[in-house]
Regions:
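Nucleotide-activated chemistry modules centered on ATP-dependent adenylation/adenylyltransferase
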Residues: 1-227
């Protein structure tokens, strides 16, 4: 059975990196270049991604002829209570996407503290919940395709083939035995690529620019190169 075949409502979660882009390519390949109507590709922008990441998402759409739904959070004060905040999901595009951290800044103002390894609310509020909001408009239940590789087993086993209460979670790259070496080999042979360093299939510059999950030395290196 092809692990990339889709026959039910599915959200292909595209983070903007090479691995999830490879997952998207394999899904397209499994359907002769045209995703079924049940599938939607989503990219949740936090405003803290590198400009190259946003360009890469658009390049994938253009080169592969696939529609990608760009989503962002809007967090604003709402109601009469002083500390009441409303969380909304809006569609944007490559042209209109936030590039100065606006969604992230709004979230921090609402929470009044920064995310950290013990409270990763940034991922939940800015990415996961935004995709769920969008999917709930069309479906009561769906499967979420997540780009976690076979060499990321500790991450994969926590969510692969598991439900979180509103969606089934599935990691096709993990199921297919794909490693970062496969991702590297794929991208060095394409006519376009993410314009960030390719360190054997991974990059220190991916996802949010100064994410706390990146080591201190990596964050300092990024700051030195782009003050």
């Amino acid at each position: 059975m092809n692990p990339y075949r889709i026959d039910e409502p599915t959200a292909i979660s595209f983070s903007g990196g090479r691995t999830s882009a490879f997952m998207l390519y394999k899904c397209l390949e499994a359907h002769d270049g045209q995703l079924p109507d049940e599938a939607v590709v989503t990219f949740a922008n936090t405003g803290k991604e590198m400009p190259e990441t946003l360009d890469f998402v658009q390049a994938c759409a253009d080169n592969w002829g696939v529609d990608i739904v760009w989503l962002e959070a809007r967090v604003r004060r709402g109601g009469e209570e002083e500390n009441k905040y409303v969380y909304e999901t809006v569609e944007v595009s490559h042209a209109t996407a936030s590039r100065k951290g606006e969604p992230f800044t709004q979230l921090i103002e609402a929470k009044v503290y920064a995310p950290n390894p013990l409270a990763r609310f940034c991922t939940k509020e800015l990415k996961v919940d935004r995709i769920k909001d969008y999917m709930r408009v069309y479906h009561d239940w769906w499967t979420s395709y997540i780009g976690i590789r076979a060499d990321e087993r500790r991450r994969a086993v926590k969510i692969h083939n598991k439900s979180d209460g509103s969606q089934d979670q599935y990691c096709p790259l993990y199921a297919d035995g794909v490693t970062k070496e496969h991702v590297y080999d794929f991208w060095i042979n394409q006519n376009f690529d993410l314009q960030l360093p390719n360190n054997n299939g991974t990059t220190d510059w991916g996802n949010c620019d100064l994410c706390f999950l990146k080591g201190k030395s990596k964050r300092l290196s990024i700051i030195r190169e782009r003050p």
